[in-house]
């Protein structure tokens, strides 16, 4: 049963992540933020919403200080990865290039898990991961990749991918020696602490007044986004605690597939209802119809990859 549960939670995490990524695209196009550290701060500090659950589920300490420290480090690595991701989004804005490079996480996590955790999968599972990786790359290329941006974008995205992969492997190591709740709670402490550190040490003073005003005026909007983000992380982390982290990251590579369907839905909604905030996303949504034949083949490959990693 746990084999099915980790898959379902990983799938839910990918779906929620797709919604959050589309909202991130909207925020970039609407120029809500002025500096890439600003969405990093919001993403980090508002994860403190999890602490509201403490009166109901209680506080639980990991099995040792070493495990607790590893969980916190994993959270810090997570928020650091998001900073480099947002830096690329704000500096270049070409989501096809960014998505293509982010898909390297599918390859990075199995390597890191093999080296650091000794995680071993069978041949069919590795082949399934390969198909998901190839399919995810094909989805990115179907939208047209500006290869001229690759040298400039790669140096930041490779750092983001490495940090996120290391974060996931750290979390899996924590779950091998602790309960889900204690590991996730201290991982969350690292994320929130990283967000606070981003504000204190990395947000230039000339941006702070505008950031404060933006945060106040859009607080409820941010609250909704980060609640979704928290729900996605909850599902992803629960999947990691139940199944191999390599397979969890592979299933989460289905996020571009969810983006295709969600963006297509938003496109048709925008045609039916003249809502300005929906119409802002129309150009991005329209891009999802480019290279549809290639995308169909890519999604078929990914579906077969999912079948292979679920063969047991």
For each predicted feature, which ranges?
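Polytopic alpha-helical membrane proteins, predominantly small-molecule transporters/carriers
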Residues: 1-312
């Amino acid at each position: 049963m746990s084999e099915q549960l980790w898959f379902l939670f990983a799938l839910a995490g990918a779906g929620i992540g797709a919604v959050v990524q589309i909202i991130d695209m909207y925020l970039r196009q609407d120029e809500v933020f002025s500096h890439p550290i600003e969405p990093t701060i919001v993403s980090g500090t508002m994860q403190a919403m999890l602490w509201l659950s403490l009166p109901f589920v209680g506080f639980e300490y990991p099995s040792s200080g070493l495990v607790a420290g590893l969980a916190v480090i994993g959270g810090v690595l997570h928020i650091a990865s998001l900073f480099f991701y947002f830096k690329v989004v704000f500096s270049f804005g070409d989501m096809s290039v960014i998505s293509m490079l982010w898909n390297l996480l599918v390859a990075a996590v199995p390597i890191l898990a093999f080296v650091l955790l000794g995680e071993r999968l069978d041949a069919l599972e590795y082949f399934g991961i390969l198909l998901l990786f190839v399919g995810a790359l094909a989805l990115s290329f179907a939208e047209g990749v500006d290869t001229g941006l690759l040298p400039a974008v790669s140096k930041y995205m490779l750092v983001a991918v490495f940090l996120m992969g290391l974060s996931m492997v750290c979390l899996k190591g924590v779950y091998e020696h602790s309960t889900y709740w204690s590991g996730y709670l201290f991982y969350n402490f690292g994320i929130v602490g990283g967000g606070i550190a981003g504000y204190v040490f990395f947000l230039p003073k000339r941006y702070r007044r505008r950031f404060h005003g933006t945060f106040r005026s859009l607080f409820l909007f941010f609250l909704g986004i980060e609640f979704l983000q928290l729900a996605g992380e909850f599902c992803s982390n629960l999947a990691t605690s139940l199944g191999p982290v390599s397979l969890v990251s592979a299933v989460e590579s289905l996020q571009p597939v969810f983006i295709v369907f969600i963006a297509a839905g938003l496109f048709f909604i925008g045609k039916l209802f003249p809502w300005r905030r929906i119409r802002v996303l129309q150009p991005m949504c329209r891009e999802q119809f480019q290279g549809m034949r290639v995308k169909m083949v890519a999604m078929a490959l990914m579906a077969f990859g999912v079948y292979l990693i679920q063969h047991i």
